[in-house]
Amino acid sequence: MDCTVKWTGEGMSFLAETGSNHALIMDGAPEAGGRNLAPRPMELLLAGTGGCTAFDVVMILKKGRHAISGCEVNLKA
């Protein structure tokens, strides 16, 4: 797995490009020099943690042939 993160040259915005050919923008809070145009890097870290957890739970339940009506992970940091 790999990822490249580049500063866009504007404020505190960064472009991340993943090894699976996806891209996303990250930005900082205005008080930190950002423009609040995209999620903060730490918010994406939290979202990734929740996404990995939900992914694993759903995958395990599907492998066990359980009926799944939903899955929601709430995180706070």
Regions found by a protein language model. Give the residues of each.
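Extended beta-strand/beta-hairpin segments
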Residues: 1-47, 58-77
